[in-house]
Swiss-Prot record:
UniProt organism field: Salmonella arizonae (strain ATCC BAA-731 / CDC346-86 / RSK2980)
Protein name: Putative transport protein YidE
Family: Belongs to the AAE transporter (TC 2.A.81) family. YidE subfamily.
GO cellular component: plasma membrane
UniProt cross-references to HAMAP family, sorted A to Z: YidE
Gene name as annotated: yidE
Transmembrane segment boundaries: 4-24, 28-48, 65-85, 95-115, 158-178, 371-391, 403-425, 437-457, 464-484, 533-553
GO biological-process terms attached to the record: potassium ion transport
Mode of membrane association: Multi-pass membrane protein
Keyword terms of this UniProt record: Cell membrane, Membrane, Repeat, Transmembrane, Transmembrane helix, Transport
Residues in RCK C-terminal domain copies: 192-276, 279-361
Locations listed in the record: Cell membrane
GO MF, any single term: monoatomic cation transmembrane transporter activity
InterPro entries: AAE_transporter, RCK_C, RCK_C_sf, Transpt_YidE_put, YidE_YbjL
Leader peptide range in chain numbering: none
Amino acid sequence: MSDIALTVSVLALVAVVGLWIGNIKVRGVGFGIGGVLFGGIIVGHFVDQAGMTLSGDMLHFIQEFGLILFVYTIGIQVGPGFFASLRVSGLRLNLFAVLIVIMGGLVTAILHKIFAIPLPVVLGIFSGAVTNTPALGAGQQILRDLGTPVDLVDQMGMSYAMAYPFGICGILLTMWLMRLIFRVNVEAEAQKHESSLANGHSLIQTMNIRVENPNLNNMAIQDVPILNSDKIICSRLKRDDTLMVPSPGTIIQAGDLLHLVGQSTDLHNAQLVIGKEVDTSLSTRGTDLRVERVVVTNEKVLGKRIRDLHFKERYDVVISRLNRAGVELVATSDASLQFGDILNLVGRPASIDAVANVVGNAQQKLQQVQMLPVFIGIGLGVLLGSIPLFVPGFPVALKLGLAGGPLIIALILGRIGSIGKLYWFMPPSANLALRELGIVLFLAVVGLKSGGNFVNTLTQGEGLSWIGYGIFITAIPLITVGLLARIFAKMNYLTLCGMLAGSMTDPPALAFANNLHATSGAAALSYATVYPLVMFLRIITPQLLAVIFWGIG
């Protein structure tokens, strides 16, 4: 059997064993995709015992390409919400998550200096303790750029594997500890979260208002400032028994019922100006109007603003909401359409069908992947990651590397959405498939390289002390920030659990947090809010630590 065939066969075996290990769960918690690392260690141990030789160049390529696929697809997935998560609504959550990352780096630095832990080993412990595989890849990349011998770089994977198990268990223990210390009633926390959402500014809501302000009688909608703003959409108007779709020139009269869409505060302000909120239904049932959701798939409208498409004027159709990457937004006139946007339309059936034809609404296109943008994005990411940044006092140029470059490019492209006929939307199923393939390939190679000496290191070497160092890196930041967030910020327990899971980019921890309350989305919401920024910082941190400690010795 050729070296290539043997290498591929061994990698396939690693994937099978590792994914099987990852599917083993104890009380609903398992290693997940991280099981591939341990599958690689097991297979690597027996490969070493058997004296088999695998293709080193091929393993290196597969490891790096797998990492590129993984971080690129993550960036494309979270790109649309990344910059939004940095705004005020998620600022507090992101600040606490960033504090966890910074504290983890500081604890790592202190351990490195006090116990003289070799740099590759301590970076591996850090990556495993925070259960972040891209951090491992970024650390190995910068160590190679610094000229670290290959055998020492491979130690990073071994120390990562030592620290990884408690990295997963540690966050679950922290959640349990917070619940015990503060005697948390999970059901009450879920109700508080729902109440805060109802009174907050983050959810798009609706309100039916009767026009009672005499100053508005016989005025056009476009002449009423509160109705002619990008904060409020008037999607339906009912006069007597007639329900209609209003246009900017529609004249409103006293007694008209308006169906408004917007954020809670804006709706309240509109109600103060217009009249009284009523419980009267403005449902389209039994009328010649209907509400329908259509998806943007036509390349000709990508990047165009809603106002430039003139849906109200041409088709008598109102876009009441816009859903982008799972986030409900007010469909402002300045909003530019992106591939995969879901529009909530109100109008007559024939008019809605006409608008659907304009925007595409081709569901099958959502399942297709444009491969050209994928490779353009990967190529740009690799180029960006290879650009040297010369910093005075550092022995080598700082680079984003094969982990940071593709991630940043993917975040930007995911936010842009499309350029001309090229769109960077990727169907969730395709994104997940490429992401899982990438991380499986990466972890399989890391495990194989670590497996030969893993048992000896654990039983006869410093493996146990590495595990101890990892416990400090995992536990100190999580417990400290958890206490601060709960005591001083009065953070909701479910939100706190999601933030802790997101700060470690740990899906098994998110699954555990979600299972705390079956119907609450608090944990998932906070996880998604901090995940993009934390993932970026987790990739950058080991590179900064490596360059700093290499420079100061």
